[in-house]
Amino acid sequence: MYFRIRKLDEPDSNDNDFYVVIPVKDIFTWFCSIYSLDKTSIFIHDINNLNPNEYTIQQVIPGSDISPIKNLNEYLTNDIIITNTLDLNDLETFIYLLTNGANNSEGIKLLVTWCVYYGRLDVLNYLVDNNILPTENTLRDYLPITISENHDEVYKFIIDHEFHLGYKSNNLSWILTSEYKYINSLKYTLSNDLKLSDLIFMHHLKVEILQELFSSGYEFDNRLFEKICRTTNITLIKFFMDIGFDPMNIVIQPNQLCIYLANILLDSGRQFTQNEISQIITFSIVSDDYWDIIAFTERTGYNWNNINDNFINCIIRRGSLDHLKDILNRTSLNINRFIDNIVITAIFDSRKDLIMYAYENNVDIAKYIQSLPYSNDTNFIKWYIELLNSDGNFKSDNNIINFINHGTGTHKFEILKYLLENDCYEDPNYIIEHICCPFNIGKNNTDIHEPIVVELLNLCESKQIDVPKLTPIIISNYLLSNRKISNTLLKFGTTIYSDGIIDNDSDINNILLNIINNQCEEIKDYVYNKPQLWTNKSIMLATIISENIDLFDFLLELNRDNNLYLEQSFILCANSIKMLKHFVNSINLDITSRVRETYVYAYSIIKNKSVASYLLLYYGNDMIYDSDNIFENQKNLFVNDFLREIKNLNFV
């Protein structure tokens, strides 16, 4: 029994004539996990008949009913007959699936999580009543989070059936103490022997939750109060003291003592050593007011020469410049001891005040240029460079420009623009190299980078700076499946590259650009008169990607007696299912020896699942998967050597 899972926004059929279907045993794994716990956007179609011999892909299909993809619990078929569409809101759907084989351990575990998340008590009750449960401990590490309106009922059910469902009540405590809306569930949990003092983390506790529990008669213990006192949450500490808890009855180490409690202990007669005071103020600097800490040190007679570096570094990271100056004035410490941390922190946090403090103390801030990549503030980086360029003689070195390679933020291209506009460079070629960085960025980011790249190129043109590699890079990206970026740059017009077919026989850039731009009127005559171009694989690949069947047939005809060229063309058809089908229908050639390589190219290298699926259905699983390690020998593939040439801008 197989099912097809379809999202609401997916069409009822597809253009590729094949469908992914799921065996019943894996149905919960798929819709609970792979479809991201989304119960509102999925159809589950009950497939009654899988008979690919009735409907074929291009009139050819292997004899097996279905072709499995190794290591994935999905199957491909080109024929489905939908007998029923199942409703996930109906309990009968789950009963139907469970009684027909959807009961493997992983699927049940995910189903329980899904039911908790959506509050499906009807399904949970059915699972418990019929002893269809996860294996022991499978959910021990899962937090049972629910988004349902009936969360109180869901959590009560989990508590009552925690052993059956594979949860532990302790896992609930963190959730139930995070928001007041869970107060009823928390009370029910506490009435079933869960203790708040078993909580590992206390910082998130809400005082209104504790107030409600106290009003309802819940008894807190000293163990819980001790854990609360180890936090810096003064509101919680005050609450416990107001209801009668005494900090003198517990033992708290100085390195876990906030200033508020430390002052209370002082009032009660406790004395602290210089080392203990250092520990207290270092712990408190994260959350306590700086001047409260200073008042505590004055009260205890603290000698600031005993301070440790951790305290100073915390002031640098978390405090104000005034606090840093005050501390350094109180100690005999030299600023140079902390200057690296000051400047690097300033760059990370875009702190101009710290940079100016270092600058005014004669620190050479130029040596920290290599840290600029870690700032995401364009204005700060510009300001930093302006500070370096205060005499108008600053020229960027490779360290500044190199940060363009450390990320994909638009602000990094803005800095290149600033360097170009202000002539802050010695060699423009090094900057120009980095203008091409968008080509190495995932194609999904193209829309983000297009405007700034256009500005950079226009700026280069206005300054008469040549960008010699741009044309081959455009072509390379088009041939390497980064086509959206290439098409973006093709919009820039004839200022970037020459028009028409070029006269130099050795240069095929314009041939490829014309194919990419679908301006192929002259290409056939030109190529026909240049036999040295007949077997050029880059021309064939551009033709396949552009799906120009007329030019494709022309190139195949030129090479009809060249079996190696034809086989390699078949492999390159992995880029287009349309061209692959056309090749199969047009060329009478045994290319079975190349099917596996074509599949690896489609599935693993360019991620063209449509072509990979077509090959599985067309040629059969056995032909492709004669080995369990077909992806391990990719280095020996023809296509890898060819793609490497393209990356090197060599269009062979």
Curated annotation (Swiss-Prot):
The keyword Nuclease does not apply. The keyword Signal does not apply. ANK repeats lie at residues 77-105, 106-136, 138-167, 192-219, 220-242, 243-274, 307-337, 396-430, 468-498, 535-564. Keywords: ANK repeat, Repeat. Signal peptide: none annotated. This is Putative ankyrin repeat protein R734.
